[in-house]
Regions:
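A ligand-binding cleft/hinge motif common to bilobed small-molecule-binding domains
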Residues: 40-50, 113-120, 147-180
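Hydrophobic residues within well-ordered alpha-helices
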Residues: 24-25, 112, 141-142, 160-163
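Hinge/capping helix and adjacent helix->loop/strand transition within the periplasmic-binding protein
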Residues: 23-33, 46-136, 185, 197-230
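C-terminal lobe and pocket-closing loops
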Residues: 155-223, 234, 252-255
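Stable alpha-helical elements in mature extracytoplasmic
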Residues: 16-20, 40, 81, 108-111, ...
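Mature extracytoplasmic/periplasmic domains
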Residues: 223, 227-248
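Conserved functional loop/turn residues at catalytic and ligand-binding sites
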Residues: 16, 28, 81, 144-145, ...
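N-terminal (or domain-start) structured segment
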Residues: 1-57, 95, 121-148, 238-241, ...
Length: 267
């Protein structure tokens, strides 16, 4: 989009994001030119102690986008709505498992528990089966090992467009243009919303003038056609909050997720 002259990217994997966070903190003075992209798991993994730091140990630059969560079923499943899934669960809770791509207590599990609790079910009673790869989760869905899959909306859209799944519920307040026929949870009487945000963080101690420069560049990004093309293609929603507003947003999510994790016995 021409907003910066050049930029490089490094995928610093390891420790569920902890390696990148630790690197920024431990080498703060020499990394004022580095931004880190992170998402909801920084809140979850800090709460559970997967790594010793949390978002407060970094410079909060800007929240950028959100990816809603979705519940999907196999293309040939008799389940076509959340009402159908809840009816199947009421008839046989043990045989109505929900799968996901994260460990128990991870984001996919928490979303499934949040949705089921909002539907009046006991979140502790939901049978959740984790899978370490999307292919394994899809195989389980198609074989009937799980009745539904908790996943990100953008991934659900890709699977639905490929004819592999049906989206039976989205955790957005309103329908999303990327899948206009997919009903929200709210439409189906399930009073819950959830968004997996993505945002930019910087090393602690970042000078104020450099922070403002980064925030201004991100704000300008939203007005570019290049950004809109990427956003629409992925079904993302713009969630722009900088500095203190970003902190307030993260603290609110930390409380909601923390309360649910305590109820589920993960804290």
């Amino acid at each position: 989009a021409g907003l910066v002259g050049s930029a490089s990217y490094e995928n610093m994997s390891g420790g569920g994001g902890g390696k990148a966070i630790g690197f920024l903190i431990e080498n703060a003075d020499s990394n004022h030119g580095t931004l880190m992209v992170n998402s909801t798991p920084i809140v979850i993994r800090s709460l559970t102690g997967v790594f010793p730091h949390n978002f407060r140990d970094l410079t909060l630059v800007s929240g950028t986008i959100g990816d809603y969560a979705a519940m999907v079923v196999g293309k040939d499943s008799p389940i076509n709505s959340m009402d159908d899934l809840l009816a199947a669960y009421d008839a046989d809770p043990g045989a109505t498992a929900i799968g996901g791509g994260s460990v128990p207590g991870g984001m996919d599990h928490l979303v499934a528990a949040m949705v089921m609790e909002a539907a009046g079910k006991d979140a502790l009673g939901v049978k959740y089966i984790p899978y370490d790869a999307g292919g394994k989760a899809m195989a389980a869905l198609l074989s009937g090992e799980i009745a539904a899959l908790s996943t990100g909306f953008s991934e659900a859209v890709d699977l639905a467009n490929a004819g592999e799944v049906k989206i039976i519920g989205v955790t957005s307040e309103e329908r999303v243009d990327a899948a206009p026929d997919a009903m929200t949870m709210m439409e189906q009487g399930i009073d819950t919303t959830f968004v997996n945000w993505r945002g930019f963080f910087a090393a602690p101690g970042l000078p104020d003038d450099q922070l403002v420069m980064y925030q201004d560049a991100i704000a300008k990004m939203y007005d570019t056609p290049e950004w809109e093309e990427v956003r629409a293609r992925n079904g993302w929603v713009n969630i722009h909050n900088s500095g203190d507003d970003f902190k307030t947003f993260l603290e609110g999510q930390e409380k909601v997720i923390g309360d649910l994790m305590k109820k589920l016995g993960f804290l």
